[in-house]
Amino acid sequence: MSRSTPLKKVRNIGIAAHIDAGKTTTSERILFFTGMSHKIGEVHDGAATMDWMEQEKERGITITSAATTCFWKDHQINLIDTPGHVDFTIEVERSMRVLDGAVAVFCSVGGVQPQSETVWRQANKYGVPRIVFVNKMDRIGANFYNVEDQIRNRLKANPVPLQIPIGAEDNFKGVIDLVTMKALVWEDDTKPTDYVEKEIPAELKEKAEEYRTKMIEAVSETSDELMEKYLGGEELSLEEIKTGIKAGCLSLSIVPMLCGTAFKNKGVQPLLDAVVAYLPAPDEVPNIKGEYEDGTEVSVKSTDDGEFAGLAFKIMTDPFVGQLTFVRVYRGCLESGSYAYNSTKDKKERIGRLLKMHSNKREEIKVLYAGEIGAVVGLKDTLTGDTLASEKDKVILERMDFPDPVISVAVEPKTKADQEKMSIALNKLAQEDPSFRVSTDEESGQTIISGMGELHLEIIVDRMLREFKVEAEVGQPQVAYRETIRKTVEQEYKYAKQSGGRGQYGHVFLRLEPLEPGSGYEFVNDIKGGVIPKEYIPAVDKGVQEALQNGVLAGYPVEDVKVTVYDGSYHEVDSSEMAFKLAASMGFKEGARKAGAVILEPMMKVEVETPEDYMGDVIGDLNKRRGQVNSMDERGGNKIITAFCPLAEMFGYSTDLRSQTQGRATYSMEFDHYDEVPKNVADEIIKKRNG
């Protein structure tokens, strides 16, 4: 059975946006116009087909990226829905890995919001070409040109409008297509219709000419021959313009801009045309990098020929089929009923059924070809970020980085009988979401869950109740503090035990040095002349790593330190790995006490948007929370305050902010970096921990 859509005509795209820019509505309309869904779901009444988990329907925010397949002008579009809430950046990061292109949706009134910046950064990190859709052009205060400026100034990108709006707010009628120089008008507001091509209205002719010239200038810079033609005063043909836009889009040197209102069904068809015309096919993006077990690098080309290689990028539990693993195929093809090799875990997996998801319906298929995305039923050992490959070519594709959680809470089931159900539920949820961790507190025996923010953990507890019927009590949130050192010290430690028969002997000299924030842990072996035999060096490293788990001040993990073992001695008979491990571990602890140990806390980047009247109160309150105000800005008549605040001071902030501003301010917060805790606060923390 050969593929129904040639590789050239496949598009893997994500729709990325800030909350409320209208991303889900845009996805819905895409599914509608491509003929997949018959009744349009509105987010307002909680019926959108992409938002298929119950909590999303209630909260009206999109949490999990469902991958949906639809067709437009004989192209297959695999649409990956990405969440817009900052606690779910991990989901966005994960979908960015498997996208070839993205549609960034901005609200014509709100413009570039804090979350848009995060998503934009992630798209830059993975080199994802994107086009911009300025949505909600029918809203009061809609301004296409403002958004263009913000993309240039705040996101430091090069936006190139391919359309300009005809009217705005209530008078938004359609768009002027600058490529064909025609007006596209939607005449019926009430139902989804095709547009009508008309001549450009006289009052917009001059503006259209001005923007077309800007577009042609940008296009001519994408290649020498277009530049020559343009400078020589020749007209560029329609084909040349389109080729130039695509080249600029793929090289990330330009960001094509379109506009419309998805809710009123205007602008969606031209957006789909642009996806097909300007976003890349799987073989038009740089090959994905991979490596073999021995570390040799290899580049994996998107083609049906060649051994199978794919990436598992999402795991979900489906009430009817059980566990679904979403896979993007990069090379070769994956057949149902066959075997694949999980090269990350070194395990063979049987491929059960293969499904293509159409937002809430599923279609069973026999084969997934290169460049396609689908779900596999029944994988046992495969987790998010694992590579599936062929046994003949055990390539490991680049891994995804997942951030460490910054907030923890203790959970216990309401009834003792639910204890086992709760641990099954939590383990399932942790498999789906690598930024969520489950552990047990050794002293109290409590179950601790950790994640990227309060909302993240709320939703986990909520899902336990809905999907696994486990009601849980949640403790006070705990902050993930860390410890580090500020001074370089040298420390000798001798571990010697002589108690009849064979003794224990390990002797080390360690140098502890502070590293730049975010560097983690580095171990250096600087032993000369075999004063400690080679085979004991890994034990020294291991001993230090064990000591790093519990710092000397309050028992928090120690990071950003470099440890060098540079001298020592051993005993022919009594030395053992155990002895060197203990010597290193105790030596590190003793050294750390002299090295100016400090406690670090997670600092959050907080952005508050508030009416000007409340600005003083908001800033005063942030200062009370030990926040440092970083910048002030204006957006749409409101003040935007950006500050760095300790996570420990931000619990319950949403309630306080609401009461301070009568519910008129909004805020977003994401983890930014770790910073030293002031001495008085550190003393409190130490007292509490060592109580």
Swiss-Prot record:
Q: Which GO terms describe its biological process?
A: ribosome disassembly
Q: Where does GTP bind?
A: 17-24, 81-85, 135-138
The molecule here is called: Elongation factor G
Question: What is this protein's function per UniProt?
Answer: Catalyzes the GTP-dependent ribosomal translocation step during translation elongation. During this step, the ribosome changes from the pre-translocational (PRE) to the post-translocational (POST) state as the newly formed A-site-bound peptidyl-tRNA and P-site-bound deacylated tRNA move to the P and E sites, respectively. Catalyzes the coordinated movement of the two tRNA molecules, the mRNA and conformational changes in the ribosome.
The keyword Nucleotide-binding belongs to this UniProt entry's keyword annotation: yes
The listed locations are: Cytoplasm
Q: What is its main location?
A: cytoplasm
The protein's gene is named fusA
Q: Which CDD domains does the protein's record reference?
A: EF-G, EFG_III, EFG_mtEFG1_IV, EFG_mtEFG_C, EFG_mtEFG_II
Q: Domain named tr-type G: which ranges?
A: 8-283
